[in-house]
Amino acid sequence: MRTRYWRLVSLITTWHVAASVCYYAVFAGTTLLRDAFGLSPVSVGFVVTTLTLGYAAFLLPLGVATDRFGERRTLSVGLLGLAVGVALIAAAPTFELVLVAAFLLGSFYGVATPGTNKAIFDNVDPSRQHRAIGLKQVGPPLGSAISSVLVTGLVGVLFWQAGFLVAAAVGLAVASLFYVAYAGAGASEAAYPDFRGLLGNRSYLLLVAAGTCLGAVFYTTTGYTVLYVEESIGAAVAVGGLVLAVLQAFSSAGRVLAGWLGDVLPGEPRTRVGSVLSVQALGGGVLFLLVPAASTPLEAGVVFALLGLFALGSVGLYYSFISIVVSEDDIGSASAGGQFAATFGGLFGPPAFGYLTESIGYGAGWRFLGGLSVLAVGLVIVVLLGSR
């Protein structure tokens, strides 16, 4: 039983890492695309926006497909599509085709959250589900780090498309491995999700609202860390990149630790998972108020490490909590809805933070994120105190 658990979690985590290597290659390669096609900063922004729109547009449809056809099919096809998408970016002869490829790439990444969550909750014993979610959620930051090394590292040795092509090869290899290896992992066919039930589930809707706040916090923090360290602390861009790496590393640690606590603490699953999630988000809210007090790179590194552990580390338990308040047959669609909310938060959070920073200062921006964290805590507490 223990061997099967680690085999399954390792397989799902490997899938998540490979998918993230393909998806985040675009973020790592923005400067390469700029130089290759002579893009302006606005045009580079369009690439990222198109990628994100593709992701957001297909989250719910792919969540439905996962509930209907099973995660083995959707995750295998999804990773194959990601590999093709990142390869098309490398092969695109014009900027317009880069945008088409970016949209395709983003759309296939939409299967990641509903598919991997369903794989965990359908096949892992309830006593170990939350730490399994925490472990597989290490995939995005690890995949992002790997793609950064591939895309920016190989350009000086080979050609600018090399990193994208290697990412595509990784995606193809892992997609094949996953399709073969997951066959005996206990996948099952599911019926169409109960949308009426989800819309009538007060706890789920409150968590979706909380996810919007947490998503805004996550995307804004990761997007502005390097810039803040450079402009406010006065450190070099490379130092800001190091602080960002620390933030991501502690984010991974926070997800694993929170998942473990969600499994081993006493009490009902709803109570212990919701409580740990509340503590993480509240801790993040307090820490955001301390960011302006950091005056050296070391102090910034410490504060952002703690932010990773608390604010960004809450991602895993957020999906765990969603799985508790919905039925098993609806986990794929419910997870997709939660991720859609987080992505929506990522669309409005950074511009709002930027506006506050320009008009008032960074302190106002960090207080804004702290307020969103506290709002998320309030919504989670309402779910804890209420019932479906």
Task: Identify the meaning behind each predicted range.
Residues 38, 70, 90-96, 234, ...:
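Helix-breaking motifs and short loop linkers at transmembrane-helix boundaries and internal kinks
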Residues 270-317:
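C-terminal transmembrane helical hairpin of 12-TM major facilitator-type secondary transporters
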Residues 58-70, 255-269:
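Helix-to-loop junctions at the C-terminal end of transmembrane segments
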Residues 99-142:
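Cytoplasmic helix-loop-helix junction between adjacent transmembrane helices
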Residues 127, 135-183:
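Helix-loop-helix hairpin linking two adjacent transmembrane segments in secondary transporters
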Residues 323-362, 369:
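A late C-terminal transmembrane helix in Major Facilitator Superfamily
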Residues 26-27, 203-245, 249-256:
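Extracytoplasmic gate region of multi-pass secondary transporters
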Residues 57-94:
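Conserved MFS/SLC helix-loop-helix module at the cytosolic interface between two early adjacent transmembrane helices
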